[in-house]
Amino acid sequence: MKAFMDKDFLLETETAKKLFHDYAEKTPILDYHCHINPKEIAEDRQFDNITQVWLGGDHYKWRFMRSCGVDEKYITGDASDYEKFCKWAECLGKAIGNPLFHWSHLDKNTADEVWNLCNEKLQQPSMSVRNLIKQSNVTLICTTDDPIDSLEWHKKLAADDTFDVKVLPAWRPDKAMNIEKPDYLDYLEKLAAAAGMT
């Protein structure tokens, strides 16, 4: 029986396999749209559990969970990280064919085993944010940043010669587009202040 995700995942022809394994596989990753918090990179965060890694700030997963009817308590609310992880696992059966399923590949029957195994591995120093980035052969990360962000963590990373992965801010002005939000005018005031226009 073929494994779900082996070394040839998504490589359906011999040409695809040759191009990937002989040329692309060892190419460094330039991640121009990343949701990793630059503070977590600067501080080299060591996560306590898999929920913090997978669900902590991933609005794509949150949106999918909401579309599955999951109560907000289990998404951004006060449920425990374990409860949030279990709700995520329950939803994945509805994500077959979606990259969310490929990235996670678990269900409510395997949730406990995956939870325990991942959390055990996450305690190892080699699983800190910086070490995960380095092990993944990443050489550039562009974080998604609002125009009013201070970029203080980017400045700290730029001055840190112990970490040779370039971490740059990328333009993500979503809040500037949300004119229907009740706090839009407050946002414009913050934007004006950030631009030195007040």
What annotation goes with each model-predicted range?
Residues 2-29, 34-198:
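Metal-cofactor-binding active-site regions of metalloenzymes
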